[in-house]
């Protein structure tokens, strides 16, 4: 089957560590005997998934499917959780660890959203000499990321490099930053997270006229110190799935 769809040789072959012998050894023997070529260049054998420090199995009644998990969490959170440990190490699934993964992913997404917001409202277009010097410092994060991925697909350390970039971006940008500088930081963050399949560059949802009107009305209410009305509008928007965040640079919003 693999020969039919992938050819006589495979770049990467993955599977559970319990399949090394005899399953994968038999695949190698059959394929290389038939084709006279190396079957797979790289083998990636993952360790097992445990549930609350116990082996996941139907007999123990702790078996969880991806579909069941998706009812509680966005599957991007599950991806982040699985990438947070080296694939050759056992991974423990628990509600606490999933919440930690959710918070970690939100931290990255929020950084990306903030860079987009600042860029959209930036008064200056071109990078300053100081910003250029700052951006050069991000080369270290890229080097750390690439070093981790080249070290047997060490996604845990790669994510650590992404968090270093997030911390840098949060600490070295503000409303005075140029659009070019903010754009470069955003593009770099997207470039690294794309490698991991993490989608931080979410397309902005277009607000319909009613919601736009409510946001404008809330701003007017705040200006008039009618905070009760402003809070009521915020609650109304939340019911529509719109979360508002008041910042010094203006109002930011995102889908709940």
What spans do the regions from the language model cover?
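Structural preference for alpha-helix termini/caps and helix-kink/transition segments
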Residues: 55-56, 62-256
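Catalytic cores of enzymes that engage adenine nucleotides and/or redox cofactors via long glycine-rich
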Residues: 1-72, 78
